[in-house]
Regions:
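The canonical Cys-X-X-Cys-His
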Residues: 78-84, 88, 141, 145
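Short, charged low-complexity linear segments at domain edges
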Residues: 37-70, 104-125, 346
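Short, structured patches in soluble enzyme cores that scaffold and shape functional sites
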Residues: 222, 300, 322-324, 351
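Short, flexible loop segments at boundaries between secondary-structure elements
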Residues: 314-343
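Iron-sulfur-cluster electron-transfer modules
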Residues: 66-75, 97-103, 110-306, 310-311, ...
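A short alpha->loop->secondary-structure connector
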Residues: 32, 239-243, 313-319
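Membrane-embedded alpha-helical bundles of multi-pass integral membrane proteins
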Residues: 1-55, 60-61
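Glycine/tryptophan-enriched, flexible segments
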Residues: 343-354
């Protein structure tokens, strides 16, 4: 009822003084980092059954009538301070996306008495397609917002509608989706080549074809980039060599790996994500069996987030470690020796948003 009153009185942005407390309380990822798992796809407040969706299920956020009560609360809580915009990488690289203006446009459209179209995105709608696809889903806007508006949730839900209902998405994504379906990676590379980097190592790397042997402590999830992309392969081989030097017993899945589904999910293709996630979860179950603690080490931040957070929505949880965490532990335990030296070049560490 606060939202109803707010839409009919003239206090405008001042309503955040009252609504912000409720918005913070009902934040989806309460007490968690801004960039967590993406929201499940809901229809009428319930998760969509992807194996047998109902005829009247709504896929994503397409019209102002699809906006949830939490969405309206987000929009009416906006202080218009612009902190989200000031941290947005898309905005700083001259893309048309401003998280602040997007939330304001959605709010004005939702509260308007008369509109040219009910749609949220497209011709005569408040949000242009280019705006929607400029988002990197990094979560900086959510992290910076003083009233915990969840911009990324709304953007991804609108993408879901555009992909699954309207089939309106950048042409480049069409190829990516096909490659993920057919080859299990974004580039359409041969699945057999996932083990190519192993042949370039001068030490043994165990590839498991069934259940993980008891003596193996860690499953090293290589990921698509780590297996195919030349620069990322250097990281994969370096991490594997360091684990070998430290005496860590690890194994990889090799060609049993397939993409986690992160590119599909963040691009709005929730159906494809669910297929890839289900396939990987079955592989994990076969690999870990009845093991209590299931340790997975990754180099890719996207794999780290998707497997560690998004897969948990399906009820399957793993103990995820980024390779930097494990290497740090090995150094502290004395299993890896470092030899400090003065670098003759400047080194920049990219701390990924994921």
């Amino acid at each position: 009822w606060f939202i109803v009153i707010a839409s009919n009185l003239t206090m405008g942005v001042a309503w955040h003084r009252f609504l912000a407390f409720f918005n913070i309380y009902y934040k989806r990822n309460i007490d968690k980092p801004a960039l967590g798992a993406l929201p499940e796809m809901l229809s009428k407040g319930k998760p969509v059954n992807f194996e047998d969706p109902a005829e009247d299920d709504v896929f994503g956020l397409g019209t102002r009538g699809d906006i949830s009560w939490k969405g309206l609360l987000d929009m009416t809580s906006c202080t218009e301070c612009g902190r989200c915009q000031s941290q947005c990488p898309a905005w700083h690289t001259d893309k048309p996306l401003s998280p602040k203006l997007l939330i304001m446009a959605m709010r004005d459209h939702a509260m308007a008495k008369v509109v040219e179209t009910e749609n949220l995105v497209g011709d005569k709608a408040p949000i242009d397609l280019d705006v929607l696809w400029s988002c990197t889903s990094c979560g900086a806007c959510v992290e910076e917002c003083p009233v915990d508006i969840e911009h990324v949730d709304h953007i991804v839900n609108m993408r879901r509608f555009q992909v699954l209902v309207e089939s309106e998405f950048p042409t480049e994504l069409g190829g990516t989706f096909r490659n993920l379906e057919k080859s299990g990676n974004p580039w359409g590379a041969n699945k057999q080549d996932r083990e190519g980097w192993i042949a370039e190592c001068d030490f043994p790397v165990r590839v498991v074809s069934g259940e993980l042997p008891e003596e193996v402590e860690y499953l090293f999830w290589v990921g698509c980039a780590g297996a195919y992309e030349e620069r990322a392969k250097k990281t994969t081989k370096a991490v594997a060599e360091l684990l070998h030097m430290a005496g860590v017993n690890f194994a990889v899945l090799g060609k049993r790996e397939t993409c986690t589904g992160d590119p599909a999910r963040r691009s709005g293709n929730e159906f494809l994500y669910q297929i890839l996630a289900a396939e990987n979860i079955e592989t994990f179950k076969e690999t870990f069996g009845n093991r209590g603690v299931k340790k997975v080490v990754v180099t890719c931040p996207h794999c780290f987030t998707t497997i560690g957070k998004d897969y948990a929505q399906s009820g399957y949880e793993l103990q995820m470690l980024h390779h930097t965490q494990l290497l740090n532990t090995l150094v502290k335990e004395g299993k890896l020796k470092t030899s400090p030296h003065k670098a003759d070049q400047k080194i920049t560490f990219h701390d990924p948003c994921y």
